[in-house]
Amino acid sequence: SVADDKVVSKGDVSGWDYDPAVGDKCAVIDFSDVKDQGTYKIVLDTGAESYEFPVGDGVYDDIYKASVLMFYDQRCGTELDSAIAGDFAHAACHTGTAIVYGSDVAKDVTGGWHDAGDYGRYVVPGAKAVQDLLLTYEDSEYAAKDDAIGIPESGNGVPDVLDEVRYELDWMLKMQDETSGGVYHKVTGEVFPEMVAAVEENAQMILSPISNTATGDFAAVMAKASVVYRKYDAAFADSCLAAAQKAWKYLEQHQGDAGFKNVGSIVTGEYP
């Protein structure tokens, strides 16, 4: 214990093995017998000491909050509050309509999250992030209750993780073709943007063709969302379920379609 320099647990360390992700030898140490909350460190017989670490309730709360706030920082099509986003704050970006590839049809697909390394918005990785966050809500009692992370929707009676996920879901619903039920794969420029701020990327946004990959991922997370959100907003849950069913019908009619490949001069992320 760091507070009083007392030893609270002893044991042997075995099973050392090289971990390429860490770049060093690692071993698992079980100190589940330590029940008192506090700050601790591990000291080896050689005198080597670990970093100090906490034991107690809620030790991952700050990491969880930071993770949700990261998604807020990725929001597209809306102004980011400097009190929340700090250096990442900006005015509303990418507010224009997108053009369906190979046509002159314009479509409103504003909203959603920017992708990891560019300002495109992609259904496939977006759906993966949505599913991970919905599982977090289901598996974590803390996440299921926390409504005070500090996003604009905090305090509305809905867990903040669901508020943040809904921002992406609302965008995904716009990505579904109203007639066929298929889902456009992504909305990006023709090429990756330069190293510029979000509001400075002014390339024409293009909706890449509908894909089974995007449509399948969309159907899955919308079906999941229809269950999770029902206790908070039944009308929204119904919309998610209807969208999932429509996407599923599209997939039944296009079972032989191949995975996604970039078309024309578009070279942004494929997520096939």
Predicted regions span which residues?
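Acidic/aromatic-lined carbohydrate-recognition and catalytic surfaces
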Residues: D19-V22, E49-K65, A144-E164
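An acidic-aromatic substrate-binding cleft motif
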Residues: A48-V124, K128
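Well-ordered alpha-helical scaffold segments within catalytic/enzyme domains
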Residues: L44, V130-E153, D170-M175, D217-A234
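Aromatic- and glycine-enriched glycan-recognition loops and surfaces
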Residues: I29-S32, H114-V124, I151-D170, A203-T213, ...
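A conserved hydrophobic secondary-structure block that centers on an alpha-helix together
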Residues: G155, P159, V199-E201, M205-Y250, ...
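Long, well-ordered core segments of solenoidal/helical folds
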Residues: G58-A83, E164-S180, L241-G259
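Ligand-binding face of N-terminal immunoglobulin V-set domains in extracellular IgSF glycoproteins
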Residues: S1-Y60
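Glycine- and aromatic-rich loop/turn segments at beta-sheet edges
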Residues: Y101-A116, Y142-I149, Q176-A203, L251-P272
